[in-house]
Curated annotation (Swiss-Prot):
Gene3D superfamilies: Ribosomal RNA adenine dimethylase-like, domain 2, Vaccinia Virus protein VP39
Recorded name of the encoding gene: rsmA
Function: Specifically dimethylates two adjacent adenosines (A1518 and A1519) in the loop of a conserved hairpin near the 3'-end of 16S rRNA in the 30S particle. May play a critical role in biogenesis of 30S subunits.
Major location (coarse): cytoplasm
Coiled coil: none
InterPro entries: KsgA/Erm, rRNA_Ade_diMease-like_C, rRNA_Ade_Mease_Trfase_CS, rRNA_Ade_methylase_Trfase_N, rRNA_adenine_dimethylase, SAM-dependent_MTases_sf
Protein name: Ribosomal RNA small subunit methyltransferase A
GO molecular function, one term: 16S rRNA (adenine(1518)-N(6)/adenine(1519)-N(6))-dimethyltransferase activity
Length: 298
């Protein structure tokens, strides 16, 4: 049975958070990027943004002492929370003791066998959403690991450093746009839902955070001949942001006359000027470029 808690008993209330940490003698580890959210209004906004209800299973990453988990468990069919810090497992058993729809998995999400784990949901056929306050130091590896996995995650609503959220959701011809924008938006739509100030965390991080909502596309944004080559071309085009596309391409592929002839032919096929910078190219442009370079033998 799921028990709905009263507002003043919320885990995220600062006094409750402090009492829990003191009771268990918990100290923060910088290596785990631990910052616990202490604002119940923001937690409710996260759940609302993710549109969590009884027809959804949730995977949470880094539950901490269970502040967000509590809100998720009240709304979702089931929550599977991955926590790498084994010191937090007994704390979560304490703070979430009233819920029978929460599984705490003491594993690194990057090493977990997710295909096996999701079968542990009581109803594994329900749509799965990822909702999490991601550690700043490992946000991108976790996101790309989950996005590129074969798990049919429906959407992600995740908190991360504001700068990273801006980069992921960026459009061409903006300072934030780059290979990360392309890597994520190829698979998913991405939009910043709202900003979270640094002042609502314990301990307070050095920067503000953002809630990013990403919804998986029915199919990738574009069709390309070779996905690995497409991502490789997009990455190398931003190695030196102030350099032209031509300079970045020749720095990677080489500057022999044969290579330069192939690059010129590929750029012409894609109808892209060598003097342009990578930040001016759309994902569709990069798709055309990658296919053209592949066609000329690069």
């Amino acid at each position: 049975m799921i028990i709905k808690r009263r507002e003043y008993m919320r885990i995220a209330d600062y006094s409750v958070t402090k009492a829990v940490l003191d009771r268990h003698g918990f100290t923060f580890k910088k290596s785990f990027g631990q910052n616990f959210l202490t604002d119940t209004n923001i937690l409710q906004k996260i759940v609302d943004t993710a549109e969590i209800d009884q027809n959804v299973n949730v995977i949470e990453i880094g539950p901490g002492i269970g502040a967000l988990t509590e809100f998720l468990a009240e709304n979702a069919a089931e929550v599977m929370a991955f926590e790498i810090d084994d010191r937090l497992v007994p704390i979560l058993a304490d703070t979430l003791r009233d819920f029978d729809n929460v599984q705490v998995v003491n594993q690194d999400i990057l090493k977990a066998d997710l295909q096996t784990q999701i079968k542990q949901f009581k109803n594994p056929d329900l749509p799965i959403k990822v909702v999490a306050n991601l550690p700043y130091y490992i946000t991108t590896p976790i996101l790309m690991h989950l996005i590129e996995s074969k798990i049919p995650f429906q959407e992600f609503v995740v908190m991360m450093q504001r700068e990273v959220a801006d980069r992921i959701s960026a459009e061409p011809n903006t300072k934030a746009y780059g290979s990360l924008s392309i890597a994520v938006q190829y698979y998913m739509t991405a939009k910043v839902a709202f900003i979270v100030p640094r002042t609502v965390f314990v301990p307070a991080p050095n920067v503000d955070s953002a809630i990013l909502k990403m919804v998986r596309r029915d199919q990738p944004l574009i069709e390309v001949e070779d996905e690995d080559f497409f991502f490789r071309v997009s990455r190398l085009s931003f190695v030196h942001r102030r350099k032209t596309l031509w300079n970045n391409l020749t720095s990677h592929f080489g500057k022999s006359e044969d290579i330069k002839a192939k690059l010129e032919k590929g750029l012409a096929l894609a109808d892209i000027k060598p003097s342009i910078r990578g930040e001016a190219l759309s994902i569709q442009d990069f798709g055309k470029l990658a296919d053209a370079l592949k066609e000329v033998g690069l």
